[in-house]
Amino acid sequence: MSYISGARLVADEQVRIASTKMDGIGPKKAIQVRSRLGGNIKRKELTKYQIDQIEQMRGQDHVVHWELKRGERADIERFISISCYRGIRHQDGLPLRGQRSHTNARTSRKRIRK
C-alpha cells in the first residue's frame, strides 16, 4: 500500500486501474498513463522516475479538483450577483433545471425552512 498524490494505491494492481483512484485521472487518462510508462506494469514495479512522470501528467493537462470546485463556486456566485433565475434558485436552495418542486425536492425545502 502506497500513496501517490494523496491516493492510496494497492501494490498488486495494474497502473491503469490504480491510477483511476487518483483525483483527476479517469479511464481514458489512465490508458494514456499506461502507454507512456510502457505496457501493463503493476504499482509495485514502478520506479521513482515513473511515479514522478505520473504526477507530472496529472498536473499538466487538467484542472485539479480544488481549482475545479473554486471555479464552480465562482460561477454560482456570479449567477447570484446578476440575479438570474439560476442564481435565485441557488440562493433559495431549490432545484435549478426545471424539476418539479411542489411534491419533490423535499430535502432542499426542509433545509430552507429551518
Curated annotation (Swiss-Prot):
SUPFAM superfamilies, sorted: S13-like H2TH domain
Keywords from the UniProt entry? Mitochondrion, Ribonucleoprotein, Ribosomal protein, RNA-binding, rRNA-binding
Give TM segment ranges: none
Q: Where in the cell is it found?
A: Mitochondrion
Q: Which domain of life is it from?
A: Eukaryota
InterPro entries (alphabetical) = Rbsml_uS13_C, Ribosomal_uS13, Ribosomal_uS13-like_H2TH, Ribosomal_uS13_CS
Start and end residues of each stretch annotated as Disordered: 92-114
Keyword Cell division (UniProt): no
UniProt GO BP? translation
Question: Which stretch is the leader sequence?
Answer: none
Major place of residence: mitochondrion
- What role does it play? Located at the top of the head of the small subunit, it contacts several helices of the 18S rRNA.
* Assembly: Part of the small ribosomal subunit.
The similarity annotation says: Belongs to the universal ribosomal protein uS13 family.
What is the protein name stated in its UniProt record? Small ribosomal subunit protein uS13m
Which species does the entry assign this protein to?
A: Oenothera berteroana (Bertero's evening primrose)
